[in-house]
Amino acid sequence: MFNRVFTRSFASSLRAAASKAAAPPPVRLFGVEGTYATALYQAAAKNSSIDAAFQSLQKVESTVKKNPKLGHLLLNPALSLKDRNSVIDAIVETHKNLDGYVVNLLKVLSENNRLGCFEKIASDFGVLNDAHNGLLKGTVTSAEPLDPKSFKRIEKALSASKLVGQGKSLKLENVVKPEIKGGLIVELGDKTVDLSISTKIQKLNKVLEDSI
């Protein structure tokens, strides 16, 4: 049986995040999953248990990935509340030392039939945890793979820019998307700089359409 006091406590942290009453997270996240991840981060931060929450999320995520049947159950929106609670009980029983805030998160997701959001929430929390530890992950999207020299030059320039910030380490990844046609799209945390040719074409088309 879930402890509803703890569940309501975690739900309160969600409302605090939504009202921006709590301390701001190191990176802004969006969407339902981002809201849950931010609420978990802020709740854990109050008790200096961010790392414990991150480790617990990884344990649950690993358990789900190793058990396809369990993963299927989590993604099944038709599952009854009783069955969802049973799934959570099984996960908690497997990891008896899970962080309390993560357990409460699972309970809230179960009650709101949003267990299917867990994987993205865990991923979003990872972004917050990295930023908390001074590591900023980013992507530079190009139409073709960047050669090592160009990639290093871009990485060096971004590391020294205000987009990264002083005292932070940048971990950059090159993502290839031929559909952008050319140019670059840089994404660092919650910031995006779109210098792709496809976007420039879209803007030009809009100007032409508006002028007709």
UniProtKB/Swiss-Prot annotation:
One Pfam family per UniProt: OSCP
Any GO BP: proton motive force-driven mitochondrial ATP synthesis
InterPro entries: ATP_synth_OSCP/delta_N_sf (IPR026015), ATPase_OSCP/d_CS (IPR020781), ATPase_OSCP/dsu (IPR000711)
Subcellular localization(s) per the UniProt record: Mitochondrion; Mitochondrion inner membrane
MF GO annotations: proton-transporting ATP synthase activity, rotational mechanism
Similarity comment: family membership: Belongs to the ATPase delta chain family.
Function according to Swiss-Prot or TrEMBL: Mitochondrial membrane ATP synthase (F(1)F(0) ATP synthase or Complex V) produces ATP from ADP in the presence of a proton gradient across the membrane which is generated by electron transport complexes of the respiratory chain. F-type ATPases consist of two structural domains, F(1) - containing the extramembraneous catalytic core and F(0) - containing the membrane proton channel, linked together by a central stalk and a peripheral stalk. During catalysis, ATP synthesis in the catalytic domain of F(1) is coupled via a rotary mechanism of the central stalk subunits to proton translocation.
Record's subunit section: F-type ATPases have 2 components, CF(1) - the catalytic core - and CF(0) - the membrane proton channel. CF(1) has five subunits: alpha(3), beta(3), gamma(1), delta(1), epsilon(1). CF(0) has three main subunits: a, b and c.
HAMAP family associated with the record: ATP_synth_delta_bact
Protein name, as recorded: ATP synthase subunit 5, mitochondrial
